[in-house]
Curated annotation (Swiss-Prot):
Ca(2+) 2 binds at D194, N196, D198, E205. It is found in: Cell membrane; Cytoplasm; Cell projection, Dendrite. GO terms for biological process: chemical synaptic transmission; membrane repolarization; muscle contraction; potassium ion export across plasma membrane; regulation of heart contraction; regulation of potassium ion transmembrane transport; regulation of signal transduction. Regulatory subunit of Kv4/D (Shal)-type voltage-gated rapidly inactivating A-type potassium channels. Regulates channel density, inactivation kinetics and rate of recovery from inactivation in a calcium-dependent and isoform-specific manner. In vitro, modulates KCND1/Kv4.1 and KCND2/Kv4.2 currents. Increases the presence of KCND2 at the cell surface. One of its GO terms (molecular function) is calcium ion binding. SUPFAM superfamilies: EF-hand. Component of heteromultimeric potassium channels. Identified in potassium channel complexes containing KCND1, KCND2, KCND3, KCNIP1, KCNIP2, KCNIP3, KCNIP4, DPP6 and DPP10. Part of a heterooctamer composed of the tetrameric channel and four KCNIP1 chains. Probably part of a complex consisting of KCNIP1, KCNIP2 isoform 3 and KCND2. Self-associates to form homodimers and homotetramers. Interacts with KCNIP2 isoform 3 in a calcium-dependent manner. Interacts with Naja atra venom CTX3. It is a peripheral membrane protein. One of its GO terms (cellular component) is Kv4.3-KChIP1 channel complex. The lineage of its organism: Eukaryota, Metazoa, Chordata, Craniata, Vertebrata. It comes from Homo sapiens (Human). This is A-type potassium channel modulatory protein KCNIP1.
Length: 227
């Protein structure tokens, strides 16, 4: 399921990219695992409003059936809590510490802040990460970086996310990172985004900065085709 939109352009890694690539892996894995079965049987238990989810997301009804069966296989209760989410996520980054980034990512999936992610939450985010427009992906990324959900990103929030990404990558980075590398990257990007120099980045500033600066867009990896 999962740095959403990657890490900065100077960071190269032997690991897979976080949010979008893991989301893509999950979708492919579950589709391959279940598709043959779906050819012969109907999904007997569906969340309410499957047709509504089809209208609200960029998935077909068949794709939603595949995703739902896979979600139920991984989470029989129909919801996933943060501890389980962290355990699943950590499997993709065995050489680093993914717990902090998984915490932030879980909060971005848990849009209602209930402490659990339902299938509806999961598939809505997955739709954005895999098939959303650039604008939708940027808004989702802004929400990830807005840790305290006050509608703004301050430098420390950005630093917390970036540091969590580097921690998650662990030793599998090239070139080897210096301890102050995350801070240097945050300083550069925050200066570009905070256009009125008031110490915070608004959604409008974030959207404008990302769309007018090719370096920022590349660093967020919004143009990577995953479908």
């Amino acid at each position: 399921m999962g740095a959403v939109m990657g890490t900065f352009s100077s960071l190269q890694t032997k690991q897979r990219r976080p949010s979008k690539d893991i989301a893509w892996w999950y979708y492919q894995y579950q589709r391959d695992k279940i598709e043959d079965e779906l050819e012969m049987t109907m999904v007997c238990h569906r969340p309410e409003g499957l047709e509504q989810l089809e209208a609200q997301t960029n998935f077909t009804k068949r794709e939603l059936q595949v995703l739902y069966r896979g979600f139920k296989n991984e989470c029989p209760s129909g919801v996933v809590n943060e501890d389980t989410f962290k355990q699943i996520y950590a499997q993709f980054f065995p050489h680093g510490d993914a717990s902090t980034y998984a915490h932030y990512l879980f909060n971005a999936f848990d849009t209602t802040q209930t402490g659990s992610v339902k299938f509806e939450d999961f598939v809505t985010a997955l739709s954005i990460l895999l098939r959303g427009t650039v604008h939708e992906k940027l808004r989702w990324t802004f929400n990830l970086y807005d840790i305290n959900k006050d509608g703004y990103i301050n430098k420390e929030e950005m630093m917390d996310i970036v540091k969590a990404i580097y921690d998650m990558m662990g030793k599998y980075t090239y070139p080897v990172l210096k301890e102050d590398t995350p801070r240097q990257h945050v300083d550069v990007f925050f200066q570009k985004m905070d256009k009125n120099k008031d110490g915070i980045v608004t959604l409008d500033e974030f959207l404008e900065s990302c769309q007018e600066d090719d370096n920022i867009m590349r660093s967020l990896q919004l143009f990577q085709n995953v479908m």
